[in-house]
Amino acid sequence: MPIWLGILVGVVALVAGVALGFFIARKYMMNYLQKNPPINEQMLKMMMMQMGQKPSQKKINQMMSAMNKQQMK
């Protein structure tokens, strides 16, 4: 086997592995986000109402900013 053919096979295998890994990771993340959607203000408001609290916009904004800060850590 010539050396250039070995290098070519290695490069093609590397590119194919990267492409396959990208599509598998993309599919996994789309499934994950479909099963566990991120919490938005509407969902937070509904949760507060279910807990018996009256949701004010100020409280919702405080909780959203606290959740965003916690995610950044």
Swiss-Prot record:
Cellular localisation: Cell membrane
Keyword Transcription applies: no
Membrane topology: Single-pass membrane protein
Top-level taxon: Bacteria
Keyword hit for Transmembrane helix: yes
Transmembrane regions: 3-23
InterPro entries: UPF0154
Keywords on record: Cell membrane, Membrane, Transmembrane, Transmembrane helix
Gene Ontology cellular component terms for the protein in this record: plasma membrane
Family label: Belongs to the UPF0154 family.
HAMAP family per UniProt: UPF0154
Protein name: UPF0154 protein BCB4264_A3788
Organism: Bacillus cereus (strain B4264)
